[in-house]
């Protein structure tokens, strides 16, 4: 938290004195932080040494501002309620794989139009996925999310890709191939910070889109995308759409950190 806030990558609610905020003058108290110099994995080591139950010591991080940080764009009561349900379902299905962090995020189902060079992006995607450009659908969301460029925080567009077979169904992809796809696009298109690949869709427009995020990391300063079985992602997506009737599509975020941040904000 301290490293990323001082570096301008994130604004953490719990980082104060390290960025020049005098809590004694402003609030009348001094913050005592015996673990402030430790990274997350080191805090876990301390917890294990103190014999704190693993249900506490090993649980995944949760942002101080709560689910609002995973609510991209405007925060509304119904939107948060949908995200709570999607989060519960995501954690239920993915906990057995023990990713370092795994959660759901929610985006308003609104496109940024017109968007330049959509055909060019579709062509790159088709080449990497070994299909015709006609089998690729591109969506750029109106809301944006945080990323990292040159060790600094940036806001960038969220790119979503769907590929379909001859029967019109979504093509299953190995995660490693989707990682190759995001590298091919994001290394040249610095206006994007997150690349999403569609897992499932309802077929009719609804207000929201859910993004499943799962990463592997030791220090949370960098992170790799979790290589999860496609069947589990599908099961998660189908249950989300069954329980969340206002969700139109479900995607998997296949962007490592960097260029994305782990959270959407």
Language model features: what each stretch is:
Residues 1-265:
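ATP/NTP-dependent adenylation/nucleotidyl-transfer catalytic domains that generate, transfer
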């Amino acid at each position: 938290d301290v490293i990323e806030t001082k570096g301008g990558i994130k604004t953490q609610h719990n980082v104060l004195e390290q960025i020049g905020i005098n809590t004694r003058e402003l609030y009348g108290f001094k913050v005592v932080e015996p673990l402030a110099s430790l990274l997350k994995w080191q805090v876990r080591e301390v917890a294990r040494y103190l014999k704190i139950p693993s249900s506490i010591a090993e649980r995944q991080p949760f942002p101080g501002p709560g689910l609002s940080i995973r609510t991209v764009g405007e925060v509304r009561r119904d939107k948060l309620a949908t995200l709570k349900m999607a989060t519960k379902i995501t954690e239920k299905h993915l906990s057995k794989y023990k990713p370092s962090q795994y959660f759901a995020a929610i985006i308003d189902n609104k496109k940024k139009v017109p968007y330049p060079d959509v055909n060019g992006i579709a062509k790159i995607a088709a080449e990497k996925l070994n299909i015709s450009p006609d089998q690729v659908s591109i969506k750029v969301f109106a809301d944006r999310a945080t990323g990292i460029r040159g060790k600094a925080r940036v806001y960038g567009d969220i790119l979503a890709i769907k590929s379909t077979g001859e029967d019109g169904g979504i093509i299953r992809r190995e995660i490693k191939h989707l990682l190759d796809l995001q590298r091919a696009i994001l290394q040249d298109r610095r206006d994007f910070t997150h690349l999403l690949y569609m897992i499932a869709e309802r077929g009719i427009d609804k207000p929201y889109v859910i993004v499943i995020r799962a990463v592997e990391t030791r220090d949370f300063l960098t992170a790799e995308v979790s290589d999860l079985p496609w069947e589990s992602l599908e099961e998660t997506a189908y249950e989300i759409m069954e329980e969340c009737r206002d969700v139109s599509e479900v995607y998997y975020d296949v962007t490592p950190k960097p260029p994305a941040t782990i959270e959407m904000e």
